[in-house]
Amino acid sequence: MGQQLAVQIFTLDAILKSLASMNNISLEVVTYLMMQYDASIPDDYKSFIQGISDATGIPYYEVMFQVTWMDVYYGILVPAAIQAQMAQMAACTAIGSDKAIGQTYDLFSIMTPTLAYVKYTLLNRRPVTVFSIWQGAFTYPMGKNDRDVMIVGNLVQNYIPGDFGTPLSIKTMMALETAKNTEECLDIMLSSFTGGYNYIITDRRGNGVAVQTIQFIPTNYDIEEINTVEVRTNTYLRPDFAYFLLDPTYALERQAKAEELANAEYNDDGKLTTSELIDIMQYNDGTPATINRYPNPYNPLETATLGYISMNKHYIKFGLGLVSDDYGIIWM
């Protein structure tokens, strides 16, 4: 896998180091922080990190930098630098019913060459095939396995430090490689709170849930069963969670517009299809309600839509770049 993703891995390595330098973040500090997650990574996944290191020649802890970058940046550095008014980087929009879910993947447009969709099969005692989006060596919770467990998610920036539990990327791999249903997937995703994330998860039986998580105990997650449709963006819907947001106004207009569009489609015939999800995710009116964000060719550090996915228990529609009807499809 490391060899096939070599270009993306080397590119992300260069970008993360450059961003750290631009923000006056010491690589020594980053290395110290990411090493704190080491004890929470199962041995099989340490072997995975070592395998990428061997395949690419990038040192182990530099691969770890990629695997843990979102946990370190948003779980530790952003809360620690609250007075610095660090920019909102993520703008993902996740939408789902009990049968179909999808999302856009939005980050700095400079991240475009780091992305790839990856399909792989683990040939263990019970083989499992996984399809998900990767950013260098980092796996984001946006994919499906051949047991028809599906997950999408988005980052929520708040000012509470995360724990040093299992990193998001590793949890995502574990969930998609082992879960047979929504409950098993959810248990893994709630096993640590390294940052604030929302998830939508469903399975072949239509056991859909929409989840909000935040990094404090005892009320660090909120789970809603999906009865019609649910939308999750880069904000919290629970007032006690929203109190801790870095920017309480961020993503509210996009949240409202996505809810409006999803409910309109669902109310039309009592279901939400993968094609309707693609249509919703193409919405762009040039305001903060926009879901499909065009890149700014003059500013690669401006957020844009870099990829998207729409899936049900039969197939996955996906693409890199802006959401469009020109998507790939995998039956899985």
Language-model regions: role of each:
Residues 1-95, 176-332:
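C-terminus-biased signal that marks the final domain/tail of proteins
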Residues 70-171, 307:
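Internal mixed beta-strand/loop scaffold within catalytic domains of large alpha/beta enzymes
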